[in-house]
């Protein structure tokens, strides 16, 4: 695998940017919106109609359509919107990194075009709550297309040395959650940059999200969810694919393996043999991956405020609201 990036903009994907020449009118909030696409239907156009009239500073959207006529139509109809057309296939985290790079606001709201986006999705009360939270990401709760609540509060758990994530319902306001479900939430730009953004070398969406989010916690920031911030899926909700693959091994070494001692973190050399046994990698490939991760942890050693064992132990008390 490639060298692990140290900053969110170190390996931004190449792209073409269209539109965004006109300023948004009636700006009310220091928030820009990144609208991600995975629905080939007509929901994107409806969503953009709502978003440009909702008081946000800027609207950015990723456009993956091969229909140049439709894209040109969008650009003409929504001159306030910045359309990003990637030159190659990109991961969700890479899209958010690029959206954050283009974002000129204090906050970036990440959404999907298969969510029901209605008028006044934000109000002064919600924005003030987000800003007062001082968290790295403020996350919504979700219902599916038949209005059933989706368990989106994610809790870390270690059982017999194995790390796992336990989902549950969000009941209380300002509930801590391990990661933003489906990448959706209001990201604080300053904190996003300070923790390095999403790792573009991790291709699995699940492990990429978990890597960013656990790093956020281990480096002393917080991720919060609230039932007053809510979205519904137009169709079926996303399925979280936690298949163990090469992305998992990089996630594991960066987040689960580090040990925190005396105000810094490191990966003990002795951990290599345990990693090699558990991975499906050859000895030489396991050693290469281990060295890359150990080097990355060493460069970021003093950013860590805890390790995964402390985070999991404290989740049941300080981090469990």
Predicted regions and their residues:
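N-proximal low-complexity "stem/linker" segments adjacent to membrane-targeting elements
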Residues: 1-49
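Acidic donor-binding segment of Leloir-type glycosyltransferases
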Residues: 49-85
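Glycine-rich, basic loop-to-helix element that forms the pyrophosphate-binding segment
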Residues: 86-103
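Short beta-strand-to-loop acidic/aromatic patch adjacent to the donor-nucleotide binding site
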Residues: 106-116
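Conserved donor NDP-sugar-binding/catalytic core segment of glycosyltransferases
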Residues: 120-154
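Short, flexible, basic/aromatic active-site loop/helix in glycosyltransferases
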Residues: 157-178
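A short, conserved alpha-helix in the catalytic core of glycosyltransferases
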Residues: 179-187, 191-196, 202-229
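Active-site-adjacent helix/loop segment of glycosyltransferases
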Residues: 223-320
